A protein has these predicted regions:
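Alpha-helical interface subdomain recognition
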Residues: 49-51, 55, 68, 72-222
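Short, structured patches in soluble enzyme cores that scaffold and shape functional sites
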Residues: 4-7, 24-27, 41, 54, ...
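Short, solvent-exposed loop/turn segments at the edges of secondary structure
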Residues: 17-18, 45-47, 192
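A short core secondary-structure module
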Residues: 1-34
Length: 222
């Protein structure tokens, strides 16, 4: 596990982001010796609440230079946002494919429901939104791979992809009607899972605040 810890008191730091250091901690050694992990039951992945008390970490476990941890972390966060965007795009495409296939197969009043524009248009719109988000994701990845600043692109890609995936999930469930709530179809499960990405690892509101301040030059809101 990687911990971001303050190694210089805030009052002595030139900026709030200074004086933070990354430490590599082996949980196999630390559990019960300074770290207590309490599981939090949820539907997506394994999550724990950590309590850290008098944990000792050897200096050789420091990642990078002391006091420069936040700078190292921020670079990885941009990659994480692009990664989450890619995951949301994959989810969105899954919802679109499932909805389109069902709309072709489901016959009501002797015609497939996909012949109706009221069914077609939401599927087409979800497809457009997902593919548009993918273009922004590629823009973020291209800049990251080139070593160029990509904070704006990575954040916007994550925001667009999370919204597109959620809208595609809602559309897919609506297309399936009552069957969308049947566990065998996996739609209701994936709908609940994809909603996570408007909350974590960074919320949509924080992304909007970042774009407003750092891209558009608006006053800092918090």
């Amino acid at each position: 596990m990687i911990l971001l810890v303050r190694t210089t008191p805030l009052a002595q730091a030139a900026r709030r982001g200074d004086g933070l250091t990354l430490l590599l901690v082996d949980l196999r050694d630390a559990l019960g010796r300074g770290i207590e992990a309490r599981p939090i039951a949820n539907m997506v992945n394994e999550t724990h609440e950590l309590f850290i008390t008098d944990l000792e970490v050897p200096v050789e476990n420091r990642v990078g230079d002391e006091g420069q941890g936040l700078r190292l972390l921020l670079d990885g966060l941009n990659a994480e946002r692009a990664l989450i965007a890619a995951e949301c795009i994959g989810d969105g495409r899954w919802f679109v494919r499932r909805a389109a296939a069902y709309a072709k197969e489901r016959v009501v009043f002797e015609r497939p429901i996909g012949r109706n524009q009221g069914v077609q248009f939401p599927i087409a719109e979800a497809h457009i939104e997902v593919e548009a988000a993918d273009l922004m994701r590629w823009a973020a990845c291209t800049r990251f791979d080139a070593g160029e600043p990509c904070g704006a692109e990575a954040n916007m890609a994550k925001c667009l992809a999370a919204k597109a995936s959620w809208q595609a999930a809602d559309m897919c469930l609506q297309t399936h009607g009552g069957y969308g709530f049947a566990a065998d179809y996996d739609i209701e499960r994936k709908l609940r899972e994809t909603r996570l990405y408007q909350v974590a690892p960074v919320s949509t509101n924080l992304i909007l605040a970042h774009v407003a301040e750092h891209v558009l030059g608006l006053p800092k809101s918090f």
